[in-house]
Amino acid sequence: MNERPILFFDSGIGGLTVLREVRVLIPETQFIYVADDAGFPYGNWEENVLKNHILKVFTNLLTLYNPTLCVVACNTVSTLMMADLRKEFPHTLFVGTVPAIKLAAKQTKSGFISVLATPGTVKRAYTRELINSFAGQCHVQLVGSEKLAAFAEDYLRGKPIDLEELRNEILPCFFEQNGKYTDTIVLACTHYPFLINLFREQALWPVKWIDPAKAIAKHIRSLLPERMYHKNTKKLKDFALFTSQNITSSTKHLLKEFGLNITKGVDFEM
């Protein structure tokens, strides 16, 4: 019996932060990485248009690749429509990436938390439900950046980043009141961990930056049968699919470092 792959989906290359952690736990599984970079960034899409687009894309992806599990490695999509995906495709296992607010609430000492996300994730009702459920006793600052995901894409491609602009994007995360300071910042976009060293350099004061990728990887492993992570050899190669034609040599090099061969210009809405 052929092993079914695990499929990762994101609007760009941010989902690689989750893929690399899953690979550590189940390295012999085949991974397919789908980057809908023709639609990047999702944070600027109207909700209904984005929902319809994602449903069409997944209809084709599931037909083509029949994955054992789909990782929606995009906070914007995960906070918008995980319920829709599970309802539309009831026989497919979906794992989303949502802001790690519960973990932040457990770890904060000051009670002051910031959630650094895209504008789409910030405005979602689901994000506020997480705050009400797990961080009701905390002061939670929601910060939606329109630039950081693109900065991460550029940074990984070796392009220069305007550090002053980056600093301005994260400044609202640092909040002080009555002698208490923000001590925990949730990275609520899978792109952002790629910028973590720059964030630390530009921070107003030391904070704990929470990247949920390791926790997501452990959750994914817990959902899979043991035979998937006790195999001795990898039978099928991993690969990446990009929906645009605009793939630079630096992107190809990056994906090669992740062991992913690229196919570009794939249209999953057909």
Swiss-Prot record:
One BP annotation, GO: regulation of cell shape
Pfam family, one: Asp_Glu_race
Annotated S-S bridges: none
Residues that bind substrate: D10, S11, Y42, G43, N75, T76, T190, H191
Keyword flag Electron transport: no
The enzyme's E.C. designation: 5.1.1.3
Catalytic activity entry: L-glutamate = D-glutamate
Transmembrane intervals: none
InterPro entries to which the protein is assigned, alphabetical: Asp/Glu/hydantoin_racemase, Asp/Glu_race, Asp/Glu_racemase_AS_2, Glu_race
Top-level taxonomic group: Bacteria
SUPFAM superfamilies: Aspartate/glutamate racemase (SSF53681)
Key words of the record: Cell shape, Cell wall biogenesis/degradation, Isomerase, Peptidoglycan synthesis
Active-site residue numbers: C74 (proton donor/acceptor), C189 (proton donor/acceptor)
Pathway it works in: Cell wall biogenesis; peptidoglycan biosynthesis
GO MF annotations in UniProt: glutamate racemase activity
Function comment: Provides the (R)-glutamate required for cell wall biosynthesis.
Family affiliation: Belongs to the aspartate/glutamate racemases family.
Name of the protein this chain belongs to: Glutamate racemase
Species for this entry: Bartonella quintana (strain Toulouse) (Rochalimaea quintana)
Protein encoded by which gene: murI
